[in-house]
C-alpha cells in the first residue's frame, strides 16, 4: 500500500471524499488538523468593474502607457498623480471620520440599547467587554492601570489561537499496573459524570491491548493515551506536566494520521471528547473548538440524536449511544455559549431519550455520577430553549409567542427543581438557603455535596440567561448573590477535591456571569445601601479567589479570568472610595468621576 503524503493530500482528502466541513472554519478539515496552508480556503471574491482605460475621467493607480501615448507630457503625468493623491486623501479622511464615529459610539455606549438588538446570549468575551464599557461610562478618568482594558478584550486575548507543537510523543507503552490505576481513577471520577465508555468493554480492550498490541488499533488507542494524560495530570508526580503532555502528544499524533476524520465512528467521538477535556487544561482553546466541531459532524453523520429504529439493537449499545450523545450535547452547548458561536447540536430535532439508571453500574461504580449527569442534561436542554425561543425570537416573534415561551421555560425550571433526586435534594436545599454545612458531609459525601454546588451554580446561570439583567435587574442581582454565596460559603468543601473535577469546569459552571452583575450593581448605584455594596465587593473577592485556585485545573484561562476580576475589583474599590469621600453629594461625585 502506497503511503499517503500528509502535506500534499490534506486538501484533496476533503475535496475528493466530499467531506462536509465545519461552516465556521476558513479551511478544509484536514488542513485545520494538520495546520497546513489550505488551497481551497474560502476567499472573498470581489468583482472588478469594467473600466474603459481610454476614459480620461477614470483615475487609476498608474496611467496606462500605450504606444499612442508614448509622448505624454510630464505635466499631464504629474496632474494624474496629484489627482490620485487627492482621492487617496479623501478616502483616508472618510475612514478617519468613521473611526471617530465608532469611538464616540463606544464612549456613549449604553447596555440597555444593546439588548434590544441582541439575539444571542452574551459570550464570556462580551461580558468582559461590558464591564470595560461600564468603567468608561461611569469613571472615564479612572487612573487604573490595566494590562488589557476589559473593553479591549477579544477572543484571541482570552482564548489563544494555538495548536500543540510537541514533537516528543510517549514512545513506550505505559506499564500495565500503572495504566490500570490511571484507568480506574478515570472511571471513578470522570466517566462517572461524563459516561463515554462501558467499563466492561473498555477493560476487555485494555487486556487485549496488553496481550497483543497489534490487535488493538485505531481510535481506542487514542482514547487510552488521552485517558492516561488526564489521570497523570491529576497525580502527585513531580513530572506530571511533562508526562501528561507527552501522553497527550501521542493521542494528537495518532489523530493526525490520514483518514481519521473521513469516516464517522462512535469510538472516534469518544476519543475526541476525551481530548477536548485535556485541551481545556492546557488552554488550547482553538484546538478545543476545532475538535468539538469535528465531534459534532460525526454525531450528525451517525444520527446519534435520534432513537434507534432497528428493534434488534442491543440495549447496552443503544444506552451507550445515548450517553455519548448527551455528553457531546452538554460539552458543545456549553463551549458555544462561552465562545459565542452558533450551536451545532442545539438546532437539531432531538429524538433521543435520557439515559436509563438501570444500566448505571456498567459505566461507574457510584450512583452519584448518573444523577448529576441526568440533571445537567435537563438544564442544558433548557439553556438551548432559552437561546432559541427567547433570544433568537426576540426581534421577530409576536408578543404572544414570546410570552408563551417565557411561561413554558419558567415552568420547566420549576419542574426541574422540584424533581431533583432525593440524594441531591437534601444538600441542594441547604445550598439554596445558604445554610451551614451538614454534619454528615464526611469524605464519602463530599463528592455528592460538591456535585450539588455545581448543579446549583448551573441552575443559577441558567436563570440569569432566562431573566436577563437588563430587563429583570433585581431578580438577576438576587440570583447572582446566591451563586457567589454558594462558592464563598462552601469553598472549603470544594477545595479538597479540585483534582477530581472535570477540566471543563469553568466552561460548565463559569461564575463570571454573576461576577459581572455584582460589579455592575456597585457602579450603577441603582439598588442597595452602602453596606450591601461592600458585601457585594466581598462576594467579588470570593469569586476572584476561586479563579486563582482554579489555575491548576484550567490553566491560562483561569489565570486571565482572575486578572480581569482583579481589575474590576480595583475599579469598584476606587469608585466606592470616591463615593464615601464625597458623601451624599451626587453632583460632586459625578464631577470627580467624569
Swiss-Prot record:
Recorded superkingdom: Eukaryota
CDD domains, per database record: fungal_TF_MHR, GAL4
GO cellular component, one term: nucleolus
Keyword annotations of the record: DNA-binding, Membrane, Metal-binding, Nucleus, Transcription, Transcription regulation, Transmembrane, Transmembrane helix, Zinc
Compartment annotation: Nucleus membrane; Nucleus, Nucleolus
Record Gene3D superfamilies: Zn(2)-C6 fungal-type DNA-binding domain (4.10.240.10)
UniProt keyword Phosphoprotein, yes or no: no
Biological process, per Gene Ontology: DNA-templated transcription; positive regulation of transcription by RNA polymerase II
Entries under SUPFAM superfamilies matching the protein: Zn2/Cys6 DNA-binding domain
Membrane topology label: Single-pass membrane protein
Entry's transmembrane regions: 501-523
Principal place of residence: nucleus
Signal peptide: none
InterPro entries: AtrR-like, Transcription_factor_dom_fun, Zn2-C6_fun-type_DNA-bd_sf, Zn2Cys6_DnaBD
DNA-binding region range list: 11-38
Annotated GO MF terms: DNA-binding transcription factor activity, RNA polymerase II-specific; RNA polymerase II cis-regulatory region sequence-specific DNA binding; sequence-specific DNA binding; zinc ion binding
Name listed for the protein in its UniProt record: Uncharacterized transcriptional regulatory protein C1773.12
Organism encoding this protein: Schizosaccharomyces pombe (strain 972 / ATCC 24843)
Amino acid at each position: 500500500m502506497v503511503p499517503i503524503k500528509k502535506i500534499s493530500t490534506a486538501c484533496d482528502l476533503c475535496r475528493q471524499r466530499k467531506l462536509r466541513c465545519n461552516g465556521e472554519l476558513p479551511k478544509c478539515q484536514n488542513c485545520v488538523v494538520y495546520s497546513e496552508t489550505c488551497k481551497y480556503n474560502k476567499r472573498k471574491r470581489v468583482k472588478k468593474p469594467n473600466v474603459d482605460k481610454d476614459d480620461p475621467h477614470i483615475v487609476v493607480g498608474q496611467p496606462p502607457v500605450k504606444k499612442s501615448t508614448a509622448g505624454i507630457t510630464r505635466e499631464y503625468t504629474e496632474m494624474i498623480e496629484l489627482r490620485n493623491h487627492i482621492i487617496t486623501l479623501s478616502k483616508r479622511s472618510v475612514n478617519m471620520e468613521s473611526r471617530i464615529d465608532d469611538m464616540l459610539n463606544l464612549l456613549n455606549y449604553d447596555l440597555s440599547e444593546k439588548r434590544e438588538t441582541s439575539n444571542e446570549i452574551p459570550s464570556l468575551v462580551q461580558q468582559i467587554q461590558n464591564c470595560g464599557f461600564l468603567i468608561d461610562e461611569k469613571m472615564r478618568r479612572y487612573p487604573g492601570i490595566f494590562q488589557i482594558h476589559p473593553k479591549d478584550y477579544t477572543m484571541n486575548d482570552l482564548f489563544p489561537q494555538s495548536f500543540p507543537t510537541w514533537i516528543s510523543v510517549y514512545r513506550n507503552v505505559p506499564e500495565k499496573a500503572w495504566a490500570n490505576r490511571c484507568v480506574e481513577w478515570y472511571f471513578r471520577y470522570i466517566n462517572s459524570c461524563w459516561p463515554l465508555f462501558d467499563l466492561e468493554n473498555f477493560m476487555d480492550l485494555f487486556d487485549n491491548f496488553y496481550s497483543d498490541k497489534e490487535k488493538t488499533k485505531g481510535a481506542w488507542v487514542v482514547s487510552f493515551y488521552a485517558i492516561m494524560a488526564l489521570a497523570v495530570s491529576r497525580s502527585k508526580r513531580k513530572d506530571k506536566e511533562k508526562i501528561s503532555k507527552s501522553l497527550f502528544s501521542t493521542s494528537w499524533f495518532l489523530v493526525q494520521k490520514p483518514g481519521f476524520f473521513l469516516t464517522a465512528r462512535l469510538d472516534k467521538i469518544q476519543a475526541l471528547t476525551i481530548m477536548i477535556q485535556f485541551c481545556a487544561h492546557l488552554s488550547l482553546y482553538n484546538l478545543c473548538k476545532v475538535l468539538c466541531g469535528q465531534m459534532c459532524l460525526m454525531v450528525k453523520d451517525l444520527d446519534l440524536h435520534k432513537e434507534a429504529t432497528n428493534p434488534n439493537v442491543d440495549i447496552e449499545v443503544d444506552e451507550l449511544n445515548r450517553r455519548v450523545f448527551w455528553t457531546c450535547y452538554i460539552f458543545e452547548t456549553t463551549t458555544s455559549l462561552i465562545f459565542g458561536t452558533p450551536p451545532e447540536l442545539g438546532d437539531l430535532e432531538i429524538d433521543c431519550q435520557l439515559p436509563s439508571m438501570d444500566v448505571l453500574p456498567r459505566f461507574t461504580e457510584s450512583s452519584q455520577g448518573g444523577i448529576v449527569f441526568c440533571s445537567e442534561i435537563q438544564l442544558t436542554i433548557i439553556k438551548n430553549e432559552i437561546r432559541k425561543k427567547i433570544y433568537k425570537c426576540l426581534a421577530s416573534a409576536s408578543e404572544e409567542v414570546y410570552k408563551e415561551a417565557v411561561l413554558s421555560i419558567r415552568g420547566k425550571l420549576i419542574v426541574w427543581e422540584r424533581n431533583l433526586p432525593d440524594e441531591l435534594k437534601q444538600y441542594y436545599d441547604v445550598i439554596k438557603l445558604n445554610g451551614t454545612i451538614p454534619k454528615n458531609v464526611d469524605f464519602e459525601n463530599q463528592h455528592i455535596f460538591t456535585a450539588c454546588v455545581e448543579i446549583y451554580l448551573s441552575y443559577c446561570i441558567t436563570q440569569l440567561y432566562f431573566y436577563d439583567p437588563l430587563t429583570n435587574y433585581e431578580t438577576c442581582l438576587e440570583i447572582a448573590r446566591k451563586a457567589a454565596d454558594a462558592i464563598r460559603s462552601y469553598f472549603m468543601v470544594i477545595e479538597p477535591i479540585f483534582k477530581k473535577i472535570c477540566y471543563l469546569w469553568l466552561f460548565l459552571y463559569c461564575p463570571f456571569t454573576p461576577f459581572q452583575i455584582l460589579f455592575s450593581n456597585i457602579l450603577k448605584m441603582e439598588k442597595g445601601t452602602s453596606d450591601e455594596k461592600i458585601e457585594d465587593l466581598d462576594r467579588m473577592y470570593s469569586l476572584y479567589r476561586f479563579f486563582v485556585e482554579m489555575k491548576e485545573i484550567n490553566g491560562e484561562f483561569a489565570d486571565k479570568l482572575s486578572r480581569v476580576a482583579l481589575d474590576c475589583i480595583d475599579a469598584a474599590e476606587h469608585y466606592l472610595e470616591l463615593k464615601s469621600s464625597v458623601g451624599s453629594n451626587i453632583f460632586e461625585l459625578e464631577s470627580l468621576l467624569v
